[in-house]
Amino acid sequence: MTLNGGSGASGSRGAGGRERDRRRGSTPWGPAPPLHRRSMPVDERDLQAALAPGSLATTAAGTRTQGQRLDWPEGSSDSLSSGGSGSEEGVYKVLLLGAPGVGKSALARIFGGIEDGPEAEAAGHTYDRSITVDGEEASLLVYDIWEEDGGCWLPGHCMAMGDAYVIVYSITDKGSFEKASELRVQLRRARQTDDVPIILVGNKSDLVRSREVSVDEGRACAVVFDCKFIETSAALHHNVQALFEGVVRQIRLRRDSKEDNARRQAGTRRRESLGKKAKRFLGRIVARNSRKMAFRAKSKSCHDLSVL
């Protein structure tokens, strides 16, 4: 499995190709850095070695031709990261997974601010962007992952490196929906002990007449596999901003939840009283008898990316 795009093409480009690599950015920090096009690393250390020191947050994002900047709608604060602007610890790695042709690359390019066209392929397929969500800035490093012919779907290093996973299918392709379910199973097996955000995305929601996967099917799948759900349209840019902002919120919610749980456990190590034990036991019985109600409640919240 590799990131879309290869490194061999850069050496054969002439002066025109090198000029495209130095396309003028539209941010106040000056020109964007040169493109980084590379294969999927064996592990995360190889990825870090492939980049210049301090440049983990300065990959292909922000590289575009003049007039092709695709901003979030007005009212959302965002900026493209400049060289060395963020530390490695402050970057969230997000992997886009899914069958070929479901629109992963289109979603990634919208996030990176790059418009589809003849120049789009030159921009690489790893995108970095800093966005402000709920008044707090976050840097996302988005990988557009694709399957090589005869390759396995998700190698171990891919499973281990993500801070969040976005599994994309097309609502017009039932097979891609089934493949998305397979990917979710693989992730669950690989990271059973990790509470990693996984978001199921039904793309191409604008193609209503060609729909093969209903909203209810997508939502039910998300509930069964314990992940979030959203439908998007890359063609109309519908819900794309909500998707990536939701990724940030899900990462933060899990981070904050772990910190709260640690504090709670540290402060409640004293022995429980008999009344508390009885209450906890009764709570378990009620929970067993309320599975259907819990399933309904979960199905109502699985599309809300602002809650766990």
From Swiss-Prot:
UniProt subcellular location: Cell membrane
Recite the UniProt keywords alphabetically: Calmodulin-binding, Cell membrane, GTP-binding, Membrane, Methylation, Nucleotide-binding, Phosphoprotein
- Report disulfide bridges, numbered on this chain: none
What molecular function terms (GO) are annotated for this protein? Answer: calmodulin binding; GTP binding; GTPase activity
Instruction: Kindly provide the PTM information from the record.
Output: Phosphorylation at Ser-26, Ser-39, Ser-273 and Ser-301 may be involved in regulating inhibition of voltage-gated L-type Ca(2+) channels.
Composition-biased stretches, type Gly residues, lie in 1-15
Question: Outcome of S26A?
Answer: Reduces amplitude of peak Ca(2+) current induced in ventricular and atrial cardiomyocytes by nonselective beta-adrenoreceptor agonist isoproterenol; however, basal electrophysiological properties of Ca(2+) channels did not differ
Q: Where is this region: Calmodulin-binding?
A: 278-297
User: Could you give the subunit structure recorded for this chain?
Assistant: Interacts with Calmodulin preferentially in the inactive, GDP-bound form. Interacts with CAMK2D. Interacts with CACNB2; interaction may be involved in beta-adrenergic regulation of heart rate and contractile force. Interaction with CACNB2 regulates the trafficking of CACNA1C to the cell membrane.
Q: Tell me the protein's name.
A: GTP-binding protein RAD
The source organism is Mus musculus (Mouse)
